[in-house]
UniProtKB/Swiss-Prot annotation:
The active site is at residues 190, 197. Catalyzes the NADPH-dependent reduction of 7-cyano-7-deazaguanine (preQ0) to 7-aminomethyl-7-deazaguanine (preQ1), a late step in the queuosine pathway. Is highly specific for its natural substrate preQ0, since it cannot use various aliphatic, aromatic, benzylic and heterocyclic nitriles, such as acetonitrile, benzonitrile, benzylcyanide and 2-cyanopyrrole, although it can reduce the substrate analog 5-cyanopyrrolo[2,3-d]pyrimidin-4-one with lesser efficiency. Its main location: cytoplasm. Pathway: tRNA modification; tRNA-queuosine biosynthesis. Its EC number is 1.7.1.13. This is NADPH-dependent 7-cyano-7-deazaguanine reductase. SUPFAM superfamilies: Tetrahydrobiopterin biosynthesis enzymes-like. One of its GO terms (cellular component) is cytosol. It catalyses: 7-aminomethyl-7-carbaguanine + 2 NADP(+) = 7-cyano-7-deazaguanine + 2 NADPH + 3 H(+). Homodimer. The lineage of its organism: Bacteria, Pseudomonadati, Pseudomonadota, Gammaproteobacteria, Enterobacterales. GO terms for biological process: queuosine biosynthetic process; tRNA modification. One of its GO terms (molecular function) is preQ1 synthase activity.
Amino acid sequence: MSSYANHQALAGLTLGKSTDYRDTYDASLLQGVPRSLNRDPLGLKADNLPFHGTDIWTLYELSWLNAKGLPQVAVGHVELDYTSVNLIESKSFKLYLNSFNQTRFNNWDEVRQTLERDLSTCAQGKISVALYRLDELEGQPIGHFNGTCIDDQDITIDNYEFTTDYLENATCGEKVVEETLVSHLLKSNCLITHQPDWGSLQIQYRGRQIDREKLLRYLVSFRHHNEFHEQCVERIFNDLLRFCQPEKLSVYARYTRRGGLDINPWRSNSDFVPSTTRLVRQ
């Protein structure tokens, strides 16, 4: 269990509780979770973070009524800056989006502006929102993470409790390499409900070469770990930076969707540009 799982800041969340579904607009349904909850134990301070990045959300179940009452549908793309005070709790996000279902808006831009305003207020940070008509995305290919997949190793694993021990002495030699590693075996659990979260991970770095077996064992150790998606990515970034000390590092996870939403956080200390094309499990 995470050290802050019972923190009072989490007590009021609708996550893990029975809730009513509202279909008329209600911004109060949105709930934020302080990023400091997991950053403080990691020694990360808001005014001196070792990374930049965003939380990229895809909204697959977004609908409202136009001014004449005709339903509209869209796919939404949201990017929340890493400097925001709060991350956005996903169940509250789903409930908030449901509140658009029977609400009339004059035009698509009013919907976009409403989302941008409410999400920014909840997160207390910078946010951008784009809405796409379905025909704009039709034929979009399934993407893949560029890099070398480390999953097909012939190793025995019998411990699934989170530990950074595997990263001790996890670099090889003195030669500096630049490579991109990929794993599809990331599985963690929701901080509150302990429901499984499934993700694919891309790690891009420059530095002494990281032992791939040790890295895979470390990633598999998240299997019983309870934390939100964004928190896991920041933990992985921080642990790799601390133990492997690369000159450059980027960590990007794309998680499978739940409740019509997928969350795709990335953190980097270089000029990393993430691909936003959905992966095969998304």
